Amino acid sequence: MKKHISFPSIEQFKNIIANVNRKHNFIGLDENGDAIYDPTKPKPKLKFKGTVKLHGTNFGVSYNAIDGLWAQSRENIITPEKDNSGSAFFVETHKTAFLILMGQIADTHKIDVKTNTITIYGEWAGKGIQKSVAIANIDKAMFIFGVKITPHPKHEEDKTPAYWVDSSFLRSPEDRIFNIEDYPQYEIEIDFNYPQLSQNKIIEMTIAVEDECPVGKAFGFEGIGEGIVFSHMTEDGEVYRFKSKGEKHSKASKVSTLKPVDDAKINNIIETVNKVTPDWRLEQMLDKTFDIMNGGKIEIKRMGEFIRNVVNDVLKEESDTIATAGLEPKDINAKVSERCRNYFFVKQNEEVGLK
């Protein structure tokens, strides 16, 4: 039976920061089956590949040996009779090309199409689909940007997660099936310990695409672009994706855009916080809060009290250091609190023998 296999919503940068932190902080489940997180674990540095985000409509083509080939929009299975901007009709009239692509995926990634569904995702873009962008001037075409493999479980309890595979080799330009990776790409390494330090570079690349769409230019049309989709694929086929869009293409609706940050100030804050919160100060305030020297125990419900003690001691003893750095207490309080929380959890874990 044909099923709609949805393409996930592309997140904002802030959501990806939260997702990466949650995954890398996860250490297991407790006796009640609830997740346990360790916020002190170092965050990863991940390389993200950026491709041009086209302003069209989401388009998927699925295949397995049992149900054959079918087309889908973001929300529904579609047919030439109930279409989405002509994309289902395009599949119907280019079946041979899509079946060849499905065969290439199955061969390259060793996919059994009797027990798995392959879905090719792309943007259906061109004349009559969207307006005010360079790509709106070309004849309609599909631009592939991803391939997902969905296993078929024999029983519901045997269900295994879908996963993503490389799609960079897929294209059939003579059939107007292109690959977004054949156009200019962008790369950035994001340190998730300090993700905001990547923000300005992301904005810079996005503005370049917004000012002149590289894909539209490749087809001979000048005009604005929508933005960039950044993605990182893990070894187990999970993909982190986030979008960065400009405002020029959307005159009516409000677009969520990244705001520039002061890299020098952020680095200054990090350096100053490290200077004013040495381990000995945190240890002193931990003892003051919990009376550890006399047998007191660390309690999570009093973590806020510990943080306040550290903040107050820093303001009392390090005001000159903060002022010399050209900062105010409000500039560093959030980072001081973060440093305190990390230290607190390290000491709590040591107390119960986890480290």
What are these regions (language model features)?
Residues 1-355:
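Core nucleotide-handling region used for phosphoryl-transfer chemistry
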